[in-house]
Amino acid sequence: MDASSVPPKVDDYGMYTTEISHHNPIELKNLLSSSDSRRNSQDEDSLPNNTNLIKEIDWQGEKVKTYPLNYQTVPLVKLQVIACLIMFVVFGMNDQTVGALLPTLIEYYHISRVDVSNVFIVQLCGYVMASLSKERLNKHFGMRGGMLLAAGLCIVFLIILATAPSSFYVCMFCGLPLGLGIGILDSTGNVLMGSLLVHKNELMGIMHGLYGAAAMVTPPLVSYFVEWGHWSLFFLIPLFFSIIGMIVIFPAFKFETASKYDYLCSVENKESNNDVEEAGDNSLMESTKASPGFFELLRNPAIFLYSLYLFLYLGAEITTGSWFFSYLLETKSSNKVAMSYIAASFWTGLTVGRLCLGFVTERFFENEYKASKAYAFLTLSSYTLFVLVGLINSSSVFYFVVLFFVVFCCGTFIGPLFPNASIVALQVLPKRLHVSGVGVAVAVGGCGGAAIPYLAGVIAHTVGIQYIPLLCWIMVALFTLEWTLYPKFIKGHEEYF
């Protein structure tokens, strides 16, 4: 390669890439890096106050345009943020739609709970496909291609679902491409927000808050469409947001090409090599040390425990959100509209917890581990009340108010556990394992988010749906126990515990 192709260091430019071209992952690298910490605390007035910050660079015969990830000075970044916020509304609705429609699908298609639970497994397969194909998508099509593919998949298959397919297996198959699209959107949104130069934490909270808010309003909305007699038309709502998102994605990501992905990956390789000594021109195209494999990463105690924690956590969270509505209808009341509001209490609490408890953590706890430990015990206490209150059979208004409040508390305290655990994991892991370690843990956690709800469907079918709260309590108790013992297995990082 000639010297003109060697890119300069671009410390002031955020990294969008999910994995580097030489198999060295860099996704979410900037979330807790020291340089980003300095940027996040930088006074906003010191940032350049002009919009002409897009630079054009020659890279392997093509023009690559780079710019700082500052939405205040680069309008294009603001559009990218807006696109991700819109698509996270689709993400939230998608995650709760299956749970809200479970009773309707069982009745409409004359299938069992086990059959309808297969949707969780199919969506997991799509999400895993997204994890395995992210690097290849970015390498060949850039982030722009990945985002357009994701929004396009949502549009096409939401249209199919809106027609109320005559076969349940068509609905089940739609979960695969939807899971693929949502997986791409999830990764892109977190990478973008985590790489912003200003207000990254606030915008990350808003994005995940929109996810929770969308999941919160889904059960009541679905119930109204079911009562109306046209349940499938609910899919027109996420379809609308997907179309708007697609319209915004076109201009927002127009410069996020495959060439830019390759350029940024090469820059990252050069910066990694410079930790040893200043590399020569040809070093940009040399492969750095190969990343450890999946099972090798799991042998690291910090990664294994983090993975197990997410497996149990996502199993408890998604099982509660997906099966709670069906549990209410079959054990408490057949009033779908009224029960949908109680079912929404969990997602309401989760949204409140993720938006508000972050401020509590900063002001009242020494570190994220201690905050998460306290929230985990509060979650366990709330789920204990959930199990006990669920044993009572009553149709009084007071009873349902108490049940609403208890489940709201379950959502509130379980909400911040995922992001806090991720912060702790990144604190104790060496920097070179940040992305690969988190990637493995999220993949394992996603398996829990599909396997446990599926197990809940099997239990509901064989022994009764009344045992769903107990299953969730067991998951919460296990991840609380693991989090309590976590420091005993992680040596040399006492300052974080």
Curated annotation (Swiss-Prot):
Any one cellular-component term (Gene Ontology): membrane
Pfam family membership, one: MFS_1
Source organism, top-level taxon: Eukaryota
Positions annotated with a glycan in the UniProt record: 49
First-listed, main subcellular location of the protein, grouped into a coarse class: Golgi
InterPro entries, A to Z: MFS, MFS_dom, MFS_trans_sf, MFS_Transporter
Sequence ranges on the Lumenal membrane side: 1-72, 166-167, 227-232, 322-340, 395-397, 461-462
Alphabetized Gene3D superfamilies for the sequence: MFS general substrate transporter like domains
Note: Present with 414 molecules/cell in log phase SD medium.
Function, as annotated: Probable transporter.
Protein name: Bypass of stop codon protein 6
Gene: BSC6
